[in-house]
From Swiss-Prot:
It comes from Anaeromyxobacter dehalogenans (strain 2CP-C). SUPFAM superfamilies: Trimeric LpxA-like enzymes (SSF51161). Its EC number is 2.3.1.191. It catalyses: a UDP-3-O-[(3R)-3-hydroxyacyl]-alpha-D-glucosamine + a (3R)-hydroxyacyl-[ACP] = a UDP-2-N,3-O-bis[(3R)-3-hydroxyacyl]-alpha-D-glucosamine + holo-[ACP] + H(+). GO terms for cellular component: membrane. This is UDP-3-O-acylglucosamine N-acyltransferase. Transmembrane segments: none annotated. The lineage of its organism: Bacteria, Pseudomonadati, Myxococcota, Myxococcia, Myxococcales. InterPro entries: Hexapep, LpxD, Trimer_LpxA-like_sf, UDP_GlcNAc_AcTrfase_non-rep. One of its GO terms (biological process) is lipid A biosynthetic process.
Length: 354
């Protein structure tokens, strides 16, 4: 089991030790569960009581944070980022064990790097490529002509369909499908004499996933009708997300669970969409846009804007509208009373109704 002194951890994350730098730590754990041999982290004031009561041997905190007397801490500008890096030290990513399981199916024309690991019942199709140190878990299917880069991890039952391209250091969580057919149909009122029908539009494009992307479990990224659906460098996509045909997701974007992005919409760099947000097709969403959970985006959004609600509006307007909801009943009563008063005054003055 790996262990590090507090000083060693500080050197790894660019932090400063307050307390015993020789303290040896053997793991990382939540504040409530950490023991004297483990390090934890504190970056959210909601957990102040847990921080003060914690039995952790040391805690990662940000500069200027008040700490209980005698507690060793590692001070660093971004405590959450430092936590992530320290956690990686104690729990390093799995490395490929260069082998192809006897029950894996590798087509003779496929090219699998000798350092890659292909587990039981994984399948690599004709002319497909799998890069160095990449791991294919059981049930993965890399289809005809698809390419998977170096240092990737494709978990159980991931599908990368024909001619799709996956970059380097990409993680695809279980059940993720890359390159499923886009939802494209043309209505045919005659149906070649057989009556009305929806005629399937061939989805002949592909999906390109750039480097350092992670795609969550059971997420679907549809292939383009023509051209490419693209997920930009460093984007992170949560579980159960739907990316439609020809969508362009900008670099470093974050799409939270159950987001849906309709066809041909373009998301700029660093867009963040909260859970269950829906974005209609053929829109332009600018760089750095923030979209609130359960929002329905139905128009282009300028770079840097934050929108909420359905239909989505600037977040400040949405907050005002939500604040008004609690008063609607009273306002309705007041309006009814005002109307009655106006009617009475008109009657007293002998005026007719307008």
């Amino acid at each position: 089991m790996a262990s590090y002194t507090l000083a060693e951890l500080a050197a790894r994350v660019g932090g400063q030790v307050d307390g015993d730098g020789k303290l040896r730590l053997e793991g990382i754990a939540p504040l409530e569960e950490a023991t004297a041999a483990e390090i934890s982290f504190f970056s959210n004031r909601k957990y102040r009581k847990a921080f003060e009561a914690s039995r952790a041997g040391a805690v990662v905190v940000e500069p200027g944070e008040k700490v209980p007397a005698g507690r060793p801490v590692l001070r660093v500008v971004n405590a959450y980022l430092a936590f992530a890096k320290i956690s990686t030290l104690f729990h390093p990513p799995r490395e490929a064990m260069p082998e192809v399981a006897p029950t894996a199916v590798i087509h003779p024309t496929a090219r699998v790097h000798p350092s890659a690991q292909v587990m039981p019942l994984a399948c690599v199709g004709p002319d497909a490529q799998v890069g160095a140190r990449t791991i294919l878990f059981p049930g993965v299917h890399v289809a005809d002509g698809a390419r998977v880069g170096e240092d990737c991890v494709l978990y159980h039952n991931v599908v990368v369909r024909e001619r799709c391209a996956v970059g380097n250091r990409v993680i695809l969580q279980p059940g993720c499908v890359v390159g499923s057919d886009g939802f494209g149909f043309a209505f045919d009122p005659d149906g070649e004499g057989k009556g009305p029908r929806h005629y399937k539009v061939p989805q002949v494009g592909n999906v390109v996933i750039e480097d350092d992307v992670e795609v969550g479990a059971n997420t679907c990224v549809d292939r383009a009708t023509l051209g490419s659906t693209r997920i930009g460098r460093g984007a992170k996509i949560d579980n159960l997300v739907q990316i439609a045909h020809n969508v362009q997701v900008g670099p470093l974007s974050l799409l939270v669970s159950q987001v849906g992005v309709a066809g041909s919409t373009k998301l700029g760099m660093g867009v963040v969409a909260g859970g269950q947000a829906g974005i209609v097709g053929h829109l332009e969403i600018g760089d750095g846009v923030r979209i609130g959970a359960q929002s329905g985006v139905m128009a282009d959004v300028e770079a840097g804007e934050t929108v909420s609600g359905s239909p989505a509006v600037p977040h400040g307007n949405w907050l005002k509208a939500m604040a008004s909801l609690d008063h609607l009943h009273d306002m309705r009563k007041e309006l009814r009373e005002l109307r009655r008063e106006v009617e009475r005054l008109r009657a007293d003055a002998g005026e007719d109704e307008p």
